[in-house]
């Protein structure tokens, strides 16, 4: 896993498809290594790198689910609502209502 992190940290692309995927992989690696905070950071960076209906909702969803796991329900709700508002037609957007309902129950 350490070698993967070293490689991905050196990886630099301007490509709007591969660059977010590399950043998302860094997030995956950090989560696997037990650092969900760093995972969230990388997922949000990946989501913001390419504003499209394929990559962005995937990484917003991953960050939202980690926030939810960490008990940060307001942050999770914000990300889920962003998916609902901007990416409703994505795979994640089509099932986002149940995630929103779940975190709202935790907040109330």
What are these regions (language model features)?
Residues 10-20, 47-56, 84-96:
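Short solvent-exposed coil/turn linkers within tandem alpha-helical repeat scaffolds
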